[in-house]
């Protein structure tokens, strides 16, 4: 009687289970912990049109994330989007008023970021985890130092969508977060209304 086939089948099943456990562990290890639970930003203390001049500062990247080349590359790309999306808005506002007066500083800062580059997406796929970025933007009265608003913004690219689009969704995330900032800025020019953050009420659903 041949007992070899059943034993081989048992080993195969055990190997499959171990492989599944290993994959789940790898996915858990790559889970992105960057999240934002708030869905809406409060209105600024005054509408932005109360100022005569506007200055858009360069993006600051939190020091904890400066060491990673992929994060630095993503920061440069976000900066490019600020130049093409936000800078024209600021320039247009500055042409409306020739009078000297108060100046509003716009200071974007990346608080947290995890960016999966195209190389990692090709070689590792969804096991690299999701991409995510969390930003704060300070709107400050240049003369008095008063903080007029400090909204937070969040975007992510899910691991599977990033992998199946070969990194397109990861890169599109960088464009989307600048779109959120631009929309908040323009919507609060004529009246202080606040705006969406891009976060989710149940941030636990964004762990991977």
List the predicted regions and their residue ranges.
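Bacterial N-terminal signal peptides that target proteins for export
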Residues: 3-19
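Hydrophobic h-region of N-terminal signal peptides that target proteins for export
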Residues: 24-30
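A structural "domain/chain start" motif
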Residues: 30-84, 116, 152, 183-208
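Surface-exposed short loop/turn segments
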Residues: 32-36, 93-147, 157-168
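Short secondary-structure boundary motifs at beta->alpha junctions and helix caps
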Residues: 67-72, 146-191
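Alpha-helix N-cap and loop-to-helix initiation/capping positions
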Residues: 74-78, 125, 169
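Extracytoplasmic/secreted envelope proteins and their assembly/folding machinery
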Residues: 79, 83, 87, 134, ...
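Ligand-binding grooves and catalytic loops that recognize ribose/phosphate and carbohydrate rings
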Residues: 90
